[in-house]
């Protein structure tokens, strides 16, 4: 998309179309970019929590919206599994405080299983 062209969400076909229009399609990529540029000045491990609107590039299907909110919790710079455990605990605590009951967390990591 060139400057001056209007972004048409109905015709956006891929992530590049959204990026060209200034719309975030993901919260993780900007975080990794920030960390790679500033990692030397950040605590190690670096913990981040982000909640914000993002947009889908594909045509939304029933029950899926073009715009939705994404919640990311990330720990960067910690090579051990302790970071993974901390993220799982944070997720279960948050879901519990939001009133969700009976949810199940599935681990799909062959080194753990």
Question: What would you call each of these model-derived segments?
Answer:
Residues 1-113:
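TRNA-recognition modules of translation machinery and tRNA-sensing kinases, especially anticodon-binding
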């Amino acid at each position: 998309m060139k400057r001056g062209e209007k972004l048409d969400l109905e015709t956006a076909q891929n992530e590049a179309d959204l990026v060209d229009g200034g719309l975030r399609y993901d919260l993780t990529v900007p975080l990794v970019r920030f960390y790679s540029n500033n990692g030397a000045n950040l605590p190690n491990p670096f913990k981040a929590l982000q909640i914000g609107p993002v947009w889908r590039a594909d045509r939304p299907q029933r029950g899926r919206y073009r715009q939705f909110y994404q919640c990311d919790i990330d720990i960067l710079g910690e090579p051990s599994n302790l970071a993974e455990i901390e993220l799982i605990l944070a997720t279960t605590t948050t879901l519990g405080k939001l009133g969700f009951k009976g949810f199940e967390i599935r681990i799909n990591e062959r080194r753990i299983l």
